[in-house]
């Protein structure tokens, strides 16, 4: 992981609140000249990170990938959609140490020693085990496979590790999914396209909050995101204190067209958990746990208004970004604006 590379991963420090990163992934590299050699890392920018590993960029890379005879490297698998950088780093560390991580139960492990489990099947099997762990299984993580051979090995599933249907797996070419500047509209991932989609969602949400005056559809409590007095902060601690006082609670706005019903995120989350959202197929970890676990995070649920299913990972991601959007809008005056701009350069 290169601490200098990012899209927008430092937004947590900008406003003193958690915001889902635009993109963060854990990747698996394979050496082209030595295809039995692998490397595991994490990044918010896969295209640039791969170029660093291959020496195309002066800065970055890693000692192991610089060794003579191993370049070029190819990225063959990427797990992404993590809710934070820290969670991605936990996944990365667990994948690097599958023989001892707490995220894989001892009776389910397929790698038992530090220097074992170095085949492609072991790497993919451990990714499957982590995707099915009680910690990671409800985050809406997604998988990209960039090679037909890797896809074949994934489907063979040599160690018989189940993953749930809510884990989205896609097969594509790395060059088709990531463009050089990450803004190519024709590529699979386009930051500009993502930002435009968010802008449309934020603008429609602004109308709901400021003009429609909708209360929470569950508790019927009025939601007021407009401060009656001028707000000015001198530090991130002031922002944290402001939010802890109950200002600007996290909101959930149904993202289905022609609905846009408003909820407190906490109200909707509790409702989804009470209703239950059974997996269509359980992971091996969940089979072992049986009914002994009460999850704190739902997978999905139905909007009480339009009756369409809402993906919790997608909704919670937009909820953190929505609050950041309104907080910046609220603070975008005078000294407060300068505070945010200066903090962005930290």
Swiss-Prot record:
| MF annotations from Gene Ontology | 5'-flap endonuclease activity; crossover junction DNA endonuclease activity; zinc ion binding
Keyword DNA damage belongs to the record: yes
Which residue ranges does the record assign to the GIY-YIG domain?
22-105
Which of the seven top EC classes does this enzyme belong to? hydrolase
EC code: 3.1.-.-
Keywords, comma-separated and alphabetical: DNA damage, DNA recombination, DNA repair, Endonuclease, Hydrolase, Metal-binding, Nuclease, Nucleus, Zinc, Zinc-finger
* Pfam families in alphabetical order: GIY-YIG, SLX1_C
Name one cellular component (GO) term.
Answer: Slx1-Slx4 complex
Question: Iron as a keyword?
Answer: no
The set of disulfide-linked cysteines is none
Co-factor(s): a divalent metal cation
Quote the CDD domains the UniProt record gives. Answer: GIY-YIG_SLX1 (cd10455)
Describe, by residue range, where the zinc fingers (SLX1-type) fall in the chain. 216-306
Which Gene3D superfamilies is this protein grouped with? Answer: GIY-YIG endonuclease, Zinc/RING finger domain, C3HC4 (zinc finger)
Q: Which residues form the signal peptide?
A: none
Q: Which GO terms describe its biological process?
A: DNA-templated DNA replication; double-strand break repair via homologous recombination
Task: Give compartment(s).
Answer: Nucleus
Q: What is its main location?
A: nucleus
Top-level taxon of the source organism: Eukaryota
| Primary role | Catalytic subunit of the SLX1-SLX4 structure-specific endonuclease that resolves DNA secondary structures generated during DNA repair and recombination. Has endonuclease activity towards branched DNA substrates, introducing single-strand cuts in duplex DNA close to junctions with ss-DNA.
Q: How does it assemble?
A: Forms a heterodimer with SLX4.
- Indicate the family of this protein: Belongs to the SLX1 family.
What is the name listed in the Swiss-Prot or TrEMBL entry for this protein? Structure-specific endonuclease subunit SLX1
């Amino acid at each position: 992981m290169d601490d200098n590379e990012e899209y927008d991963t430092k937004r947590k420090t900008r406003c003193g609140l958690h915001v889902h990163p635009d993109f963060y992934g854990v990747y698996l590299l394979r050496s082209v000249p030595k295809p039995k050699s692998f490397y595991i890392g994490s990044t918010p920018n896969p295209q640039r990170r791969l170029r660093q590993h291959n020496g195309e960029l002066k800065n970055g890379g890693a000692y192991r990938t610089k060794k003579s005879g191993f370049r070029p490297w190819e990225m063959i698998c990427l797990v992404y959609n993590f809710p934070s950088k820290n969670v991605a780093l936990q996944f990365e560390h667990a994948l690097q140490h599958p023989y001892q991580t707490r995220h894989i139960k001892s009776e389910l492990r397929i790698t038992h020693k530090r220097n074992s489990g170095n085949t492609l099947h072991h790497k993919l099997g451990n990714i499957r085990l982590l995707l099915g762990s009680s910690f990671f299984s409800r985050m809406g993580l997604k998988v990209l496979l960039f090679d037909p051979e890797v896809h074949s090995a994934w489907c063979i599933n040599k160690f018989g590790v189940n993953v749930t249907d809510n884990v989205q797996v896609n097969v594509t070419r790395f060059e088709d999914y990531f463009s050089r500047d990450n803004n190519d509209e024709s590529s699979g991932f386009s930051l500009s396209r993502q930002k435009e989609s968010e802008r449309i969602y934020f603008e429609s949400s602004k109308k709901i909050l400021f003009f429609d005056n909708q209360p929470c559809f569950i508790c019927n409590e009025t939601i007021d995101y407009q401060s009656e007095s001028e707000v000015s902060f001198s530090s991130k601690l002031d922002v944290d204190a402001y939010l802890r006082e109950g200002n600007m609670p996290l909101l959930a706005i149904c993202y289905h067209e022609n609905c846009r019903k408003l909820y407190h995120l906490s109200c909707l989350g509790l409702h989804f958990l009470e209703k239950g959202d059974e997996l269509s197929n359980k992971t091996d970890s969940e089979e072992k746990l049986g009914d002994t676990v009460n999850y704190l995070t739902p997978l999905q649920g139905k909007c009480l208004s339009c009756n369409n299913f809402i993906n919790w990972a997608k909704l919670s991601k937009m909820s953190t970004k929505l609050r950041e959007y309104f907080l910046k809008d609220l603070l975008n005056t005078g000294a407060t604006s300068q505070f945010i701009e200066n903090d962005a350069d930290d």
